[in-house]
Curated annotation (Swiss-Prot):
This is Adenylosuccinate lyase. GO terms for molecular function: (S)-2-(5-amino-1-(5-phospho-D-ribosyl)imidazole-4-carboxamido) succinate lyase (fumarate-forming) activity; identical protein binding; N6-(1,2-dicarboxyethyl)AMP AMP-lyase (fumarate-forming) activity. Keywords: Acetylation, Isopeptide bond, Lyase, Purine biosynthesis, Ubl conjugation. Catalyzes two non-sequential steps in de novo AMP synthesis: converts (S)-2-(5-amino-1-(5-phospho-D-ribosyl)imidazole-4-carboxamido)succinate (SAICAR) to fumarate plus 5-amino-1-(5-phospho-D-ribosyl)imidazole-4-carboxamide, and thereby also contributes to de novo IMP synthesis, and converts succinyladenosine monophosphate (SAMP) to AMP and fumarate. It comes from Mus musculus (Mouse). One of its GO terms (cellular component) is mitochondrion.
Length: 484
């Protein structure tokens, strides 16, 4: 059955990434309009460079191409592709139809991957340029959150069991550190992208060498000129018909790594929401459950986790594609790449938009945190109590045994009776501990159990985070708005 249907209609499937989640600017980058406009721009750049280097191309032909870059007859292109079974040649003919004087020199010396691969590389670069400031904004919002709560003690968890205290700000810095690594990795891969350039059918530049009658220097100049017109600093020296598909592995790997970071962050937020210590933003009219009106589900964090799994899973596509590219090229990369590259960036875009929205409205409940600390801190403070008793003249061994017995009794109240931890009350009631009764409040001050967490937060933000965000200073004011 032939593919059909209007992608914008209710009767046709449309990717939820485009229909529900991703930003308009990211969707446009992967649209047919942007792709085919870029093909035409590449044909223009090629013709301009060929003319400059002496090929018989007129100013009139160049001007005709310039005037029709956006004049795309998509219906004609679709009919041509149906007839020719070749998307690039369909658009060569469509462009030539509105540029009759230039029709004979469009795509001169080039192969399909001249427009296909070079356009993909332009889109990948520009897509990174959309993601980077979004990620920087997420980091900035979380950095502000961490700074404001650098001193707020909270119960730490290892194995999701109560552990030594940390601070809310320090925990947030764990999230920020991962995202900073992602920001650096995305920027590195973006900056290392190289243009495929002007290489011909199998990467040998044979067609261009023939056009320039064996002049190797002009062929190299042509490659360099088009690369510079496209805004790239370097082009591959070696290609087959395509640029190596290992580039796609690099691109999707750093996006998947970002997905892993976001999944961890949003899982933490979901767990903290269950503990009622922290919540993501919850709108006034938002409904958590159709059956349970009291529910305040962390749906934004759940969405991030859901999409992050998809983003991480996409890395298998470029890995397998690169592994099966026989010799100079096989076409079984094409259909797969049409899906995975766009989906990876639209997914990453959605995740960052959503995480920015979360980070701009995180709510903390200090009283709940304080109550949980009170439940666990007495056990954690026992070593400090023993040390204080020894300093007051007591025996370490006798004190240890007293504490052990009282701790077991308090634990039984918590676990078997569902009561509160009353260890401190038991210590206050025991005359043995009278030498330190006046010290108990000080010994149980949560801030004395957080170590250097506040200092670590401020140093980390000042020395690592703020300098990393500096290049994005002009783009920090943008707020994240979610439609759904």
């Amino acid at each position: 059955m032939a593919a059909s249907g209007d992608p914008g209609s209710a009767e046709s499937y449309r990717s939820p990434l485009a229909a529900r989640y991703a930003s308009r600017e990211m969707c446009f980058l992967f649209s047919d309009r942007y792709k085919f406009q870029t093909w035409r721009q590449l044909w223009l750049w090629l013709a301009e460079a060929e003319q400059t280097l002496g090929l018989p191309i007129t100013d009139e032909q160049i001007q005709e191409m310039k005037s029709n870059l956006n004049n795309i007859d998509f219906q004609m292109a679709a009919e041509e592709e149906k007839r020719l079974r070749h998307d690039v040649m369909a658009h060569v003919h469509t462009f030539g139809h509105c540029c009759p004087k230039a029709a004979g020199i469009i795509h001169l010396g080039a192969t399909s991957c001249y427009v296909g691969d070079n356009t993909d590389l332009i889109i990948l670069r520009n897509a990174f340029d959309l993601l980077l400031p979004k990620l920087a904004r997420v980091i900035s919002r979380l950095a502000d959150f961490a700074k404001d709560r650098a001193d707020l003690p909270t119960l730490g968890f290892t194995h999701f069991q109560p552990a030594q205290l940390t601070t809310v700000g320090k925990r947030c810095c764990l999230w920020i550190q991962d995202l900073c690594m992602d920001l650096q990795n995305l920027k590195r891969v973006r900056d290392e992208l190289r243009f495929r350039g002007v290489k011909g059918t199998t990467g040998t530049q044979a067609s261009f060498l023939q056009l320039f009658e064996g002049d190797h220097q002009k062929v190299e100049q042509l490659d360099k000129m088009v690369t510079e017109k496209a805004g790239f600093k370097r082009a591959f020296i070696i290609t087959g018909q395509t640029y190596t598909r290992k580039v796609d592995i690099e691109v999707l790997s750093v996006l998947a790594s970002l997905g892993a970071s976001v999944h961890k962050i949003c899982t933490d937020i979901r767990l903290l929401a269950n503990l009622k210590e922290m919540e993501e933003p919850f709108e006034k009219q938002q409904i958590g459950s159709s059956a349970m009106p009291y529910k305040r589900n962390p749906m934004r964090s759940e969405r991030c986790c859901s999409l992050a799994r998809h983003l991480m899973a996409l890395t298998m596509d470029p890995l397998q594609t690169a592994s099966v590219q026989w010799f100079e090229r096989t076409l079984d990369d094409s259909a797969n790449r049409r899906i995975c590259l766009a989906e990876a960036f639209l997914t990453a875009d959605t995740i960052l938009n959503t995480l920015q929205n979360i980070s701009e409205g995180l709510v903390v409940y200090p009283k709940v945190i304080e109550r949980r600390i009170r439940q666990e801190l007495p056990f954690m403070a026992t070593e400090n109590i023993i040390m204080a008793m020894v300093k007051a003249g007591g025996s370490r061994q006798d004190c240890h045994e007293k504490i052990r017995v009282l701790s077991q009794q308090a634990a039984a109240v918590v676990k078997q009776e569902g009561g509160d931890n009353d260890l401190i009350e038991r210590i206050r009631a025991d005359a043995y501990f009278s030498p330190i009764h006046s010290q108990l409040e000080h010994l149980l001050d949560p801030s004395s159990f957080t170590g250097r967490a506040p200092q670590q937060v401020h140093r980390f933000l000042e020395e690592e985070v703020r300098p990393l965000l500096k290049p994005y200073g002009n783009e920090m004011a943008v707020k994240a708005e979610l439609c759904l």
